């Protein structure tokens, strides 16, 4: 990937592109994120899905891993999006997780900054994310510069309701 890796403090934490061998830790971090947000009922990720969709022939997402002392301590997953209203490409951060022992050490900031760097290199005009209402990281997102868009609500059609819709 053509972006410089972040080094938070020399020898402390670096950000790198995720690799297939990170699939297990990615699933663990995603599960911990779901637990942190009290949304485990929605969590169904598997290593197989991560490998297929993050590293397969038709990649659906990309990921960055934060590493400290040789150990993964953070994860950012993101994918491309398009705004027809703006007529421009953007990136959306799907997941941002920092292990408890690494919180407060700017790991999340550097993960977001490197996703922003990738977005800029690719000509994206915006970076967005969706946040669970109860997520205490909302304050962090505001400090980084994300704006809460009061006029937008997210609606989701679950798979069972989607297939039921097809029968109408």
Where in this protein do the model-derived segments appear?
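A short beta-loop-alpha structural element at the N-terminal edge
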Residues: 14-28
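Conserved GNAT-fold acetyl-CoA-binding loop/helix
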Residues: 27-52
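A short helix-loop-beta-strand connector motif used in the catalytic cores of GNAT acetyltransferases and
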Residues: 54-65, 92
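Conserved beta-strand in the GNAT
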Residues: 65, 71-80
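A short, internal acetyl-CoA/4′-phosphopantetheine-binding micro-motif in the GNAT/acyltransferase core
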Residues: 96-103
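Conserved acetyl-CoA-binding loop-helix of GNAT-fold acetyltransferases
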Residues: 104-117, 143
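Conserved active-site alpha-helix within GNAT-family acetyltransferase domains
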Residues: 109, 121, 133-151, 157
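Conserved GNAT acetyl-CoA-binding A-motif
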Residues: 119-130
């Amino acid at each position: 990937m053509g972006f410089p890796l972040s080094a938070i403090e020399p020898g402390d934490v670096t950000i790198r592109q995720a690799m297939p061998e990170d699939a297990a830790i990615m699933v663990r971090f995603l599960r911990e994120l779901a637990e942190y947000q009290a949304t485990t009922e929605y969590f169904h990720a598997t290593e197989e899905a991560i490998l297929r969709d993050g590293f397969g022939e038709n990649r659906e997402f990309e990921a960055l891993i934060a590493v400290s002392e040789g150990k993964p301590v953070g994860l950012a997953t993101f994918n491309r999006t398009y705004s027809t209203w703006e007529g421009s490409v953007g990136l959306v951060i799907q997941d941002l997780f920092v292990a408890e022992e690494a919180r407060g050490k700017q790991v999340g900031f550097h993960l977001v900054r490197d996703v922003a760097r990738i977005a800029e290199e690719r000509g994206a005009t915006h970076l967005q994310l969706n946040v669970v209402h109860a997520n205490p990281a909302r304050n962090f997102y505001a400090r980084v510069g994300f704006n809460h868009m009061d006029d937008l609500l997210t609606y989701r059609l679950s798979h069972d309701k989607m297939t039921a819709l097809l029968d109408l």
